[in-house]
Amino acid sequence: MNHILQAILLGIIEGLTEFLPISSTAHLLIAEDMLGFHAPGEVFPVVIQLGAILAVVAVYWRKFWDVLVTLPSSQDSRHFVLTVLIAFLPSVVAGLLLHGFIKKVLFSPEVAPLVIATSLLLGGILILVLERVRPAVPRFSDGDRLPYAKAFQIGLCQVLAIFPGVSRSGATILGGEMLGVSRPAAALFTFYLAVPTMLGATVLDIYKNRDALVGAAWTDIGIGFVTAFLVALVVVKGFIGFLSRYGLAPFGWYRIAAGLALFAWIALA
């Protein structure tokens, strides 16, 4: 398979999985290994991730624009910005302190497959269990107006996503539900929180890999970026409706199946 087709396929995988609770990082790492896709190195997944992030901005641009223009005069806008920043803070601290450990240990070829398989399997089981014990009547149903304490607690849940295979969206949506936030509101807040979180992670990774930017295969990167953006647009637009109807259980079963399949693959390799 040539690089263009590989870039398209990886862009599709990134766009599909970035905002679903199944871990885009796990799927990209596994797909890259199976496809033998190594060029242009670590720069490719970092940049195409930005395409998926921009899909959120494209879908919710009116919300972000209204907040921006009314920020000086609107208490609601200031509250919204503060909740997102408060939830973002734990990931900033964890990312800056643990970036080297995350990349060198958790993402090492020797450790990553086992971490991913374990995270997928345990995460799937946890989803199925917690979906049964979550509060029957949510206390908070507005993703734009969460209390600061709840936003911070959701941000702490997001830190778990430093482990490949955990899923940032899965951790925040499930954590939000357990904190009394309705499923649609938790998913909406997850989308909002994704913008600074993933943008910050992307900027940090690009800076750390700045030497690799020279001579990178920008055609492959551009194709993956655009593909991830377009696919993520569809996912972002339909995800909350799907979640409201079916819940997280389908993703829990998928994660269990994927984790078991990966364990089998590791054993046979």
What are these regions (language model features)?
Residues 1-269:
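Multi-pass membrane proteins that catalyze or facilitate reactions on polyprenyl-/lipid-phosphate substrates
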